[in-house]
């Protein structure tokens, strides 16, 4: 068993370095050996360089390296430098101490992979940006269960929204399994989920997502009223909805990605 695969060993390591898990960085360290193995298996095959965001104490990093991955680990918390240098000593890892949101993701090699226990507060903006780059072959990451549900939601459900459609536009999404709070130290207050995204190669479409964001900007309103409030000509929206066979009182959450694409075509040049 890894020396980082129990709450007791993690606590001892932190105490030895005079450290504590910092909520500002969303630090909940994975301490379940079984779940570490499952994450590594879900990420295979390692067909390109692996980027890990938020390596923490290095448990997942070490597991990936031992499985043959070429890993660049990006950590914002400079306090963890001596810990990672200890836990990953002698292993061929590239450590980068930087805010992951400021990393030049658009320059990573084509076919790269993300494998990470993501700091939950940056998960949505980071995953969105990585998908937009078009440079990743696979993204496998832990997030709050609620965020995983939003990424994989179906139309007409409360979790369905902009994030669902952003993910669906760029990738095939799978929620592989859930992890209880006890799989981490310190245990978070919520369950977590492992998500795997397999990009399809679709490029970013700013016009489509302006429409989607406007549609969900006033979720309680009808789609017609939400788009009118965002500046889309009401008569043009009514005409486009009729052409799609949609009732005037339809709401944004009832449309799947293809319906939004067709609606966008019908509204082309309306704003």
From Swiss-Prot:
SUPFAM superfamilies: S-adenosyl-L-methionine-dependent methyltransferases (SSF53335)
Compartmental location: Cytoplasm
CDD domains, per database record: AdoMet_MTases (cd02440)
Listed InterPro entries: KsgA/Erm, rRNA_Ade_diMease-like_C, rRNA_Ade_Mease_Trfase_CS, rRNA_Ade_methylase_Trfase_N, rRNA_adenine_dimethylase, SAM-dependent_MTases_sf
Predominant cellular place of this UniProt entry's protein: cytoplasm
Domain of life according to the entry: Bacteria
Residue numbers binding S-adenosyl-L-methionine: 28, 30, 54, 75, 99, 117
Listed GO MF terms: 16S rRNA (adenine(1518)-N(6)/adenine(1519)-N(6))-dimethyltransferase activity; RNA binding
Sorted UniProt keywords: Cytoplasm, Methyltransferase, RNA-binding, rRNA processing, S-adenosyl-L-methionine, Transferase
EC class (word): transferase
Pfam families the UniProt entry points to: RrnaAD
Database matches in SMART domains: rADc (SM00650)
Gene Ontology terms: cellular component: cytosol
Catalytic activity: adenosine(1518)/adenosine(1519) in 16S rRNA + 4 S-adenosyl-L-methionine = N(6)-dimethyladenosine(1518)/N(6)-dimethyladenosine(1519) in 16S rRNA + 4 S-adenosyl-L-homocysteine + 4 H(+)
EC identifiers of the protein: 2.1.1.182
UniProt cross-references to Gene3D superfamilies, sorted A to Z: Ribosomal RNA adenine dimethylase-like, domain 2, Vaccinia Virus protein VP39
Biological role stated in the UniProt entry: Specifically dimethylates two adjacent adenosines (A1518 and A1519) in the loop of a conserved hairpin near the 3'-end of 16S rRNA in the 30S particle. May play a critical role in biogenesis of 30S subunits.
Family in the record: Belongs to the class I-like SAM-binding methyltransferase superfamily. rRNA adenine N(6)-methyltransferase family. RsmA subfamily.
Listed NCBIfam families: ksgA
Name under which the protein is recorded: Ribosomal RNA small subunit methyltransferase A
Lineage: Bacteria, Thermotogati, Deinococcota, Deinococci, Thermales
Gene name for this UniProt entry: rsmA
């Amino acid at each position: 068993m890894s020396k980082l695969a129990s709450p007791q060993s993690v606590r001892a390591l932190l105490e030895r370095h005079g450290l504590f898990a910092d909520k500002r960085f969303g630090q909940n360290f994975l301490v379940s050996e079984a779940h570490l193995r499952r994450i590594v298996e879900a990420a295979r095959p390692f067909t390109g360089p692996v980027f890990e965001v938020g390596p923490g104490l290095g448990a997942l990093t070490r597991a990936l390296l031992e499985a043959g991955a070429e890993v660049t680990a990006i950590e914002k918390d400079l306090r963890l430098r001596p810990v990672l240098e200890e836990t990953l000593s002698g292993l061929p890892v590239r450590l980068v101490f930087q805010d992951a949101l400021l990393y030049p993701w658009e320059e990573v090699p084509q076919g790269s992979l993300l494998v990470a226990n993501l700091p939950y507060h940056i998960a949505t903006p980071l995953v969105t940006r990585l998908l937009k780059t078009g440079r990743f072959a696979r993204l496998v990451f832990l997030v709050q269960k609620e965020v995983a549900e939003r990424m994989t939601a179906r139309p007409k459900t409360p979790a369905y929204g902009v994030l669902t459609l952003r993910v669906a536009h760029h990738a095939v999404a799978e929620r592989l399994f859930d992890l209880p709070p006890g799989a981490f130290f310190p245990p978070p207050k919520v369950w977590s989920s492992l998500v795997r995204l397999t990009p399809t190669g679709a490029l970013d479409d700013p016009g489509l997502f302006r429409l989607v964001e406007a549609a969900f900007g006033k979720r309680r309103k009808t789609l017609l009223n939400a788009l009118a409030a965002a500046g889309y000509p009401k008569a043009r929206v009514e005409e486009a909805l009729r052409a799609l066979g949609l009732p005037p009182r339809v709401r944004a959450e009832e449309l799947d990605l293809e319906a939004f694409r067709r609606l966008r075509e019908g509204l082309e040049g309306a704003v």
